[in-house]
């Protein structure tokens, strides 16, 4: 009896493996499309430029906060080394000296200049917040008081948490583990993993707390793990590039640290944004499933009608949607297909983008008929059908019949779209 079930079990396993592979391929395509659509590499460039302008003010604020607490004074040098050497591989010591020299000069500036440094540091955090929320399709800025409180908390509590972590780690390593015996090798390996673990924790908190959307813990952890691995690979590649390939020192001399610093900061922001995009895609990805849609000539209208119905209902509720928000409402549709349809409706001036990047209706659905929408949506014709339609040797004169069909369609599809959507909504409510 068991032997008879073996082929069936193998068949089901093969089907399951094939579905997993198809789902993985579809997710990779979805992830790649979102990377290009959200212009991750352009956003990373703008963040890198702003980071170069803000790095000294941020370090000045961080070190000023630490100076307020004498208990953290012994760990200040450790924090400086940790931030700078992990901030840029290969040139950390040189950069350490420059940055501390610049930060030291900020102590002599007047009160107005100190406030300006603080504002610059806050602006960097605000840009990071806005860029990450753009990935989730959230363009509504935080309220001024809420944003100020959040950024102030990050600037003040962030350094304290890092120093506390370093202090706790130092206590564990130097009290529990000794420099002699079998635990020495274990201690060395754990210390080597410490920066990687710190990266995972930092990315996890970033992806969990910054987006103004509910993010699953598993998705945030997966994104943090991916970003941490990419960061480690980027460090190794950058170290190899600087030591074996780059010619910055031959061209710029003492100023070579500037382009190298910008290049590394750009890579770091690419890693951060790629990880955020990965977290978003884990939550937004929904593989297409076959539906029982009628296979008639009107089947191409189901998608645009779903888009218009969703936007129409959202606008009536006073909550317009962006493309990302629309994809969450229509989660069963592939994102690529939905984006192409939205682009088509934008091109045909049925929709337009508001100043905040939200989708809005350009046509009055109470005046626009179903036939007008039918004319807008292209119906694909395969190569065989084209050859039959346009073959001169076997031409069939269908012009009179085509006119009659068009007239019939125009008459039968004169129903306004809004009325059709209302009837569909009432029917769905009755069924429920």
From Swiss-Prot:
GO CC list:
plasma membrane
Return the Pfam families for the record: Virul_fac_BrkB (PF03631)
Q: Which residues cross the membrane?
A: 52-72, 108-128, 148-168, 190-210, 220-240, 254-274
Q: Give the record's membrane topology.
A: Multi-pass membrane protein
Localization:
Cell inner membrane
Keyword check for Transferase: no
Asked if the keyword Oxidoreductase belongs to this entry, the reply reads no
Keywords, alphabetical? Cell inner membrane, Cell membrane, Membrane, Transmembrane, Transmembrane helix
Q: Which InterPro entries match?
A: UPF0761_bac (IPR023679), Virul_fac_BrkB (IPR017039)
Q: The organism sits in which domain of life?
A: Bacteria
Q: Which NCBIfam families match?
A: yihY_not_rbn
Family the entry assigns = Belongs to the UPF0761 family.
Protein's recorded name: UPF0761 membrane protein Cag_0935
What species is this protein from? Chlorobium chlorochromatii (strain CaD3)
Source organism phylogeny: Bacteria, Pseudomonadati, Chlorobiota, Chlorobiia, Chlorobiales
